Amino acid sequence: MDALVAHCSARLLQQEKEIKFLTAEVDRLKNYSCSEASADLEKLREENLKLKYRLNILRKSLQAERNKPTKTMININSCLEEVFGCAIKAAYPVLENPPLIVTPSQQPKFGDYQCNSAMGICQMLKTKEQKVNPREIAENIVKHLPDNEYIEKVEIAGPGFINIHLRKGFVSQQLTNLLVNGVKIPSIGENKKVIVDFSSPNIAKEMHVGHLRSTIIGESMCRLFEFAGYNVLRLNHVGDWGTQFGMLIAHLQDKFPDYLTVSPPIGDLQAFYKESKKRFDTEEEFKKRAYQCVVLLQSKNPDIIKAWKLICDVSRQEFNKIYEALDISLIERGESFYQDRMHDIVKEFEDRGFVQVDDGRKIVFVPGCSVPLTIVKSDGGYTYDTSDLAAIKQRLFEEKADMIIYVVDNGQSLHFQTVFGAAQMIGWYDPAVTRVSHAGFGVVLGEDKKKFKTRSGETVRLIDLLEEGLKRSMDKLKEKERDKVLTTEELKAAQTSVAYGCIKYADLSHNRLNDYIFSFDKMLDDRGNTAAYLLYAFTRIRSIARLANIDEEMLRKAAHETEIILDHEKEWKLGRCILRFPEVLQKILDDLLLHTLCDYIYELATTFTEFYDSCYCVEKDRQSGEVLKVNMWRMLLCEAVAAVMAKGFDILGIKPVQRM
């Protein structure tokens, strides 16, 4: 129906332009015979009236559809944009693509939302030599506002800002819908496929702190896309191919000659890698054998393939320990997966005339990129460039992805810019149709603001970092004497929740584009914008109903029967904050910056604290502690906050606990 309204509106606009033109023609021909022009004009006017009538019916029908109870939360900002978009179109039908700016107000005195389009429209009209001030434009927009269920009143402030006040009944109804139906947003990703490429460690090397960001950010993005209804393919593009496997396999043959029949106890793969690397750098004979093993691997020699699989399996077991601890879900599809596609990729670029030869290398220059891609080395081998081109083509043509997101550090931005440019140049995708993005991120720094290292100067192993987090988390809980009030199981759950939650949140709450300083002390602080504070706030909210002897069934019944009153300013502020959740998520789907969600959850928690300190949810006898009165509509507000926080935590990959 939206499309039909848009189509009618466009036709109406075109007709109004034609009427203007013909009216001018009639005026010009006043002194001459103009019966033909007049006849055309009358015909257009008649059709125009019919269209206006039809459009009015369609708009009313669309509004009636919208007024039906919905099972999902609505994006209020988008709804207001639609309303003001209609008003601007009606007020200024001749303007093409006028600015449409609706945002939440920063201060209560400016209403709940603001429309700041008048200033931009004023600039557009000035270019058409029309003298008008922004305030007059704002008044004209307000005059053309269609009937809607959202707006109580509007006020024009300053030079032309339109302050929007929402209807309390509308906000109350939306909160009731949330409580009755759960925290859901419209399925905007229905029938769309997203591929997220993240984590991607190298086989035979341990995961280190550098892999933490890609793993955490990528997982959270996947959860958000899934919540928005997308079909998500989570890919782990591991480094499981290349010359390093030659030296690893040659070393395996020497150290465990019976590896084909007896499973070799490799144990510490990192040490195994270092041993083979040392031999590769110092023993010429070993180096030759290593290169022979690479050739045999590429030709799929069965014995060499078995050795390769053994090494990959040992690595995979270590990776999976970390993925399991952090609740990360991935499908492994490493560089080896794309090996058989490399030859065809090179041929396709050659056939299209994009390949140049430079010192025996086959290179591809991409417009706007300073460094070419090397798709074949001088020794005839393929490169990361070749495998990344093979990967992007497979994802576009075989997986039929509508969107591909690469969660890889900022250092790779030029590489991905060139790969994406090459894929567009050869015609694999159109960026106007398919979104292919590099979601880059900064490095993890120590408290000295240098790259995060151990005291001996080595890269911090991720498994060690997680174990240290668990230790510090338990110390913090014992410091607060939680071990005296929680059962052993509850204490263990709280320890894991705080440790991993704090590590994830510390990363996600920073703008991913920037470097961030890793500090256990800061992330475990239960004050400020930290997971520790938010997890404590969540358990506190969850405990309010429990301590008032209100069970889930009573809350469910109340959600259907109790009107949510929003008369107190703190109730109103909290209600509006809860309902901003869908617009926050929409922004992140657009820019992939997850710290916005962290900021929102923190704002929701602090807004709840203001509400709880000002509004009694449960009134008790001060002497006996007996519950005298329960303000059920406020209990429902508590429940709505907890529900939204729980979904926010879930998207961030954080597991809250009921007791802490």
UniProtKB/Swiss-Prot annotation:
Domain of life: Eukaryota
Subcellular location: Cytoplasm; Cytoplasm, Cytosol
Residues annotated with N-acetylmethionine modification: M1
HAMAP family reported for this sequence: Arg_tRNA_synth
Self-association and partners: Interacts (via N-terminus) with AIMP1 (via N-terminus); this stimulates its catalytic activity. Interacts (via N-terminus) with LARS2 (via C-terminus). Monomer. Part of a multisubunit complex that groups tRNA ligases for Arg (RARS1), Asp (DARS1), Gln (QARS1), Ile (IARS1), Leu (LARS1), Lys (KARS1), Met (MARS1) the bifunctional ligase for Glu and Pro (EPRS1) and the auxiliary subunits AIMP1/p43, AIMP2/p38 and EEF1E1/p18. Interacts with QARS1. Part of a complex composed of RARS1, QARS1 and AIMP1.
UniProt note: domains: The alpha-helical N-terminus (residues 1-72) mediates interaction with AIMP1 and thereby contributes to the assembly of the multisynthetase complex.
Protein name: Arginine--tRNA ligase, cytoplasmic
Provenance organism: Bos taurus (Bovine)
Organism taxonomic ancestry: Eukaryota, Metazoa, Chordata, Craniata, Vertebrata
